[in-house]
Amino acid sequence: MIFSPLFANLGGDISVSRSVAFGVILLMVALIMFIVYFFMDRKLDAQTGEAEEKDEPFKISDIGKILSSYVFWLVALLCVLYYSAIFPFQKYAVNMLQCNLSFTDVAPDSFWATDAVTVIQYVIMIVIALTSFASNFQKNKSMKYALLVTSIVALVIYCYMGFMRQSASAIFAVFPLLAVGITPILGNYVDNKGKAATMLILGSLLLIACHLTFAFILPMFKGSPVGGVIVAYVTILVLGASFSLVPASLWPSVPKLVDANVIGSAYALIFWIQNIGLWLFPLLIGKVLDSTNPQIVEGLANGTLTPEQAAVSYNYTVPLVMLACLGALALIFGIVLKRLDAKKHYGLELPNVVKDEIEGGEAEIVAAEE
């Protein structure tokens, strides 16, 4: 997020292709790492003498078995609704901030206009990620709190630098930072305490609150440069927390709801359904944005508005309410799923490690009897 504008503006000639090329390079690096991992894993299997267990062959009837499951559709629809309110929003979020915040031009010779600030912010992001993530696994309380304080201070510095840059992209880049720190905490909580269905509901509630805040509260601070940025930062961070809550509880819940023999096919179908939403809703948001801002479309068509003027003039209220409605539907499915779990005892509210503990206890009893 933070480097895309930097590459797009290299040399003073704006070109999106450079940012896309940077993304392609990252994907190529990831592919190379996967290939290396694949051969290292094969080598380890050969050294240890372990062979992969033969799975049951895939059958077309498995798909029918999965699609005929009522609970599968609850999870799949909750997934597509939630993620369709997150990922398509990211596409429009920077422009939404440009339309709702009051930015001032930064002097070209100012430190805040240099590329060095972007690099410094990226380093700070890494510091936040490392310290917050490491604090989750630190047993020494003094070190744990020291890492947390370091992470919080770094986050405040990052937010201050984003404000001084007067850049919507720098402000929205804070989105994943809180998620990085709390995702391990939430995952550990689900493993040891459970409450996955409750976390799905809470994540959906936070999602609704954030989109409604962007729709109705943020525009009220249009004339307040500091107040608007503060509201934006807080809302984006809370949205990141929601983005941690749902995945941390959703994906570990699937094996509890689907037969283990078709779990791979179930995940594939969920992602397939999710990608349909990720294709459809960006188009829908664009259509709604144009239909609710006819004066901008007309101004661009007859030349009375330049693209630069139009880009900061859109009213995002209706698209944001639409995304909040997706969150409301996800909330309904989450509530239904929790009630169904209470009735059918799928174990969504139970910790994931209980089964292992029971099996371990049974093994100890058998060993003692022998």
Q: Where do the model's predicted regions map?
A:
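Helix-to-loop junctions at the C-terminal end of transmembrane segments
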Residues: 129-141, 181-195
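A membrane-interface helix-boundary motif in multi-pass transporters
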Residues: 8-25, 287-327
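Small-residue (Gly/Pro/Ala) motifs that create kinks and tight helix-helix packing interfaces
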Residues: 2-11, 94, 280-289
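Helix-loop-helix hairpin linking two adjacent transmembrane segments in secondary transporters
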Residues: 1-41
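C-terminal transmembrane helical hairpin of 12-TM major facilitator-type secondary transporters
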Residues: 147-162, 167, 173-178, 196-250
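A late C-terminal transmembrane helix in Major Facilitator Superfamily
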Residues: 260-294
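Flexible cytoplasmic inter-helical loops of multi-pass small-molecule transporters
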Residues: 35-62, 344-357
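Extracytoplasmic gate region of multi-pass secondary transporters
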Residues: 69-132, 154-179, 183, 247, ...
